[in-house]
Amino acid sequence: MSYHEIGQLTGADNETVERYIYLLEQGFVIFRLPSLSRNARNEIKRSRKIYFWDNGIRNALIGRFNPIALRDDTGALWENFLVTERMKINHYYLRYRNYMFWRTHSQQEIDFIEDYDGRLHAFEFKWNPKKKANLPSVFSEAYPGSEIRLISRENYQEFIM
């Protein structure tokens, strides 16, 4: 969601939305994840994803506390959980990484990327382990030597440890 879209929903101008996002970030309520772009024409360059450090705050703000099986935002909730827990455990163990996501103008996406040891380590998150993951070959072609892993309910524990 862009600042413009948030502004339209809330009735605030872009500058006010940016300032509020900044304040929420400074208060450790949310954080922004930048997009990866190394000059490929089809990559989105200045986009950011916004995550909540605590899914409970996210749920409170949108007023949804239904069981996971009854929710229509399971994918977003799962992604938010995995990204934040991975960043927390990396910080705890002093594993320094640069974090980002990747998206093209044609909406191909990698949910989460860590850049360390001179390589990109990409992760695609799926709540349903039986659902087919579309891992974009465009990413592998643009970033040879990168690793792409699918993270689901079956293997997430090793990801957040």
Model-inferred region functions:
Residues 1-119:
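Accessory nucleic acid-recognition modules appended to NTPase machines
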Residues 119-121, 147:
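Structural motif
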Residues 121-127:
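Terminal-proximal interaction/regulatory segments of ATP-powered molecular machines
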Residues 127-161:
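Catalytic cores of nucleic-acid endonucleases
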